[in-house]
Amino acid sequence: MVQFFQPKPKALPTQAVEITIDNLDHHLTGVGRYQGKACFVEGVLPGEKVSVQITEQKKQYAHARLRQVIEPSADRCEPFCPAFKQCGGCNAQMMPQAMQCQAKQQGVQRLFRQLAKIDLPAPLWIESSAPQAYRRVCRLAVKYDKNKRCVLVGFRQKQSQALVEINSCPVLTAALSALIVPLRTLINELSSARDVGHIELYETESGLAMLLRHNGRPPVKDKELLLAFALQHDCALYLQTTGYPEPLADVKPSFYQLDGLRLYFQPGDFLQVNPQVNQRLVNYVREWLAPTATDNVLDLFCGIGNFTLPLAREAASVTGIEGVDEMVQRATHNAEQNQLVNTGFHRADLTKMAEYANAGWQQQCYDLVLLDPGRTGAEAVMPWLAKSGARRIVYVSCNPVTAARDCALLQPGYTLKQWGLLDMFPHTGHVESLFLFERK
């Protein structure tokens, strides 16, 4: 039998090594040099001399864990959260917010240069966010601890599946943060506590809502405890076992306000977590597309109508395309509730664009196009868009890597005119960006 040679992995150094941090990548991870290659370290600032433990070595790069900051930057801040060093939710509280935004901008520009051969100018604007209490949505992890003989409720540790128990979270709204401790008490009172997978919390203009992921059907006593908790905290409670979430009892509809519109949602739907930045994002989309009363607009990856409905008030028509049936139904309902009769919504898996070549919505002509894909981007859509003939296209991105790839595919038919950056998620490596293309 043929045996293939497999080189042994290079032994990692047992002693800590010292490196100097040169810059930050788009995730706000520090980049230094170790043995002539890039070495990535979290929790550091440019210019700092640090002691690190090498945790992974590849041919072109290495990863390391910070052990000590030997020469700190004058810009280094004291993290405002006591759980920062353990919790995986935030990775940059030791960094001024202006530096975070600058690093994200430079990261996006670098990725576009490397992956798309596009030299982005300085962004037209950089929109920042309130540094704390900006999140109206969160997911809490739940795990049974055999040693403590109780259920832990909190967030995942950095680079680990282990849990960090927290009593509060300063980036959540005050109402969501205040639910964490009573939720932990509640879950530990359930006889089916080990079957709880995770908990999602929402706070919008309609009040509080909670989604509990359960691996079975909770017994009657547990349902009574859950309902009592929901009543005590005036919280709409949903349960997800298999399929889509369902209310555990009669609940008041959940909605959020946007542009004077009321958008109804159900826990489990995608929601922008930062309402203030979301409003600014919608404003910029509307300003850049600049629809008139004669324009037909296409909104790809439309969700429950976050962009569709504001655009419909100015355009002749807006067609929304979304891959999840329930969200298509929700978007249709939202248009009806807001008396917007010039909208239409269709379900389509936009990763399989060729399957919809004969769909009515794809046969229409559009003056303006908006797309807001998830982190995987919109690669399958771009060749069709490049030939669409739309006057303007606005691409909203939450992942600069896939945005660079996708924007390069538009170049045969479109010119990138301007872009902007929104710090939707301060203190994290996530970045929201906006790109305007005009037909050549």
From Swiss-Prot:
<dbReference type="InterPro" id="IPR030391">
    <property type="entry name" value="MeTrfase_TrmA_CS"/>
</dbReference>
<keyword id="KW-0698">rRNA processing</keyword>
<comment type="function">
    <text>Catalyzes the formation of 5-methyl-uridine at position 1939 (m5U1939) in 23S rRNA.</text>
</comment>
<keyword id="KW-0408">Iron</keyword>
<dbReference type="GO" id="GO:0070041">
    <property type="term" value="F:rRNA (uridine-C5-)-methyltransferase activity"/>
</dbReference>
<keyword id="KW-0004">4Fe-4S</keyword>
<feature type="binding site">
    <location>
        <position position="322"/>
    </location>
    <ligand>
        <name>S-adenosyl-L-methionine</name>
    </ligand>
</feature>
<feature type="binding site">
    <location>
        <position position="349"/>
    </location>
    <ligand>
        <name>S-adenosyl-L-methionine</name>
    </ligand>
</feature>
<dbReference type="GO" id="GO:0070475">
    <property type="term" value="P:rRNA base methylation"/>
</dbReference>
<dbReference type="GO" id="GO:0003723">
    <property type="term" value="F:RNA binding"/>
</dbReference>
<dbReference type="Pfam" id="PF05958">
    <property type="entry name" value="tRNA_U5-meth_tr"/>
</dbReference>
<dbReference type="GO" id="GO:0005506">
    <property type="term" value="F:iron ion binding"/>
</dbReference>
<dbReference type="InterPro" id="IPR010280">
    <property type="entry name" value="U5_MeTrfase_fam"/>
</dbReference>
<feature type="binding site">
    <location>
        <position position="306"/>
    </location>
    <ligand>
        <name>S-adenosyl-L-methionine</name>
    </ligand>
</feature>
<dbReference type="InterPro" id="IPR001566">
    <property type="entry name" value="23S_rRNA_MeTrfase_RlmD"/>
</dbReference>
<keyword id="KW-0479">Metal-binding</keyword>
<dbReference type="Pfam" id="PF01938">
    <property type="entry name" value="TRAM"/>
</dbReference>
<keyword id="KW-0411">Iron-sulfur</keyword>
<feature type="binding site">
    <location>
        <position position="301"/>
    </location>
    <ligand>
        <name>S-adenosyl-L-methionine</name>
    </ligand>
</feature>
<feature type="binding site">
    <location>
        <position position="372"/>
    </location>
    <ligand>
        <name>S-adenosyl-L-methionine</name>
    </ligand>
</feature>
<feature type="domain" description="TRAM">
    <location>
        <begin position="10"/>
        <end position="68"/>
    </location>
</feature>
<keyword id="KW-0489">Methyltransferase</keyword>
<comment type="similarity">
    <text>Belongs to the class I-like SAM-binding methyltransferase superfamily. RNA M5U methyltransferase family. RlmD subfamily.</text>
</comment>
<dbReference type="GO" id="GO:0051539">
    <property type="term" value="F:4 iron, 4 sulfur cluster binding"/>
</dbReference>
<keyword id="KW-0949">S-adenosyl-L-methionine</keyword>
<feature type="binding site">
    <location>
        <position position="81"/>
    </location>
    <ligand>
        <name>[4Fe-4S] cluster</name>
    </ligand>
</feature>
<keyword id="KW-0808">Transferase</keyword>
<feature type="binding site">
    <location>
        <position position="169"/>
    </location>
    <ligand>
        <name>[4Fe-4S] cluster</name>
    </ligand>
</feature>
<dbReference type="InterPro" id="IPR002792">
    <property type="entry name" value="TRAM_dom"/>
</dbReference>
<feature type="binding site">
    <location>
        <position position="272"/>
    </location>
    <ligand>
        <name>S-adenosyl-L-methionine</name>
    </ligand>
</feature>
<feature type="active site" description="Nucleophile">
    <location>
        <position position="398"/>
    </location>
</feature>
<dbReference type="InterPro" id="IPR012340">
    <property type="entry name" value="NA-bd_OB-fold"/>
</dbReference>
<dbReference type="InterPro" id="IPR029063">
    <property type="entry name" value="SAM-dependent_MTases_sf"/>
</dbReference>
<feature type="binding site">
    <location>
        <position position="87"/>
    </location>
    <ligand>
        <name>[4Fe-4S] cluster</name>
    </ligand>
</feature>
<protein>
    <recommendedName>
        <fullName>23S rRNA (uracil(1939)-C(5))-methyltransferase RlmD</fullName>
        <ecNumber>2.1.1.190</ecNumber>
    </recommendedName>
</protein>
<feature type="binding site">
    <location>
        <position position="90"/>
    </location>
    <ligand>
        <name>[4Fe-4S] cluster</name>
    </ligand>
</feature>
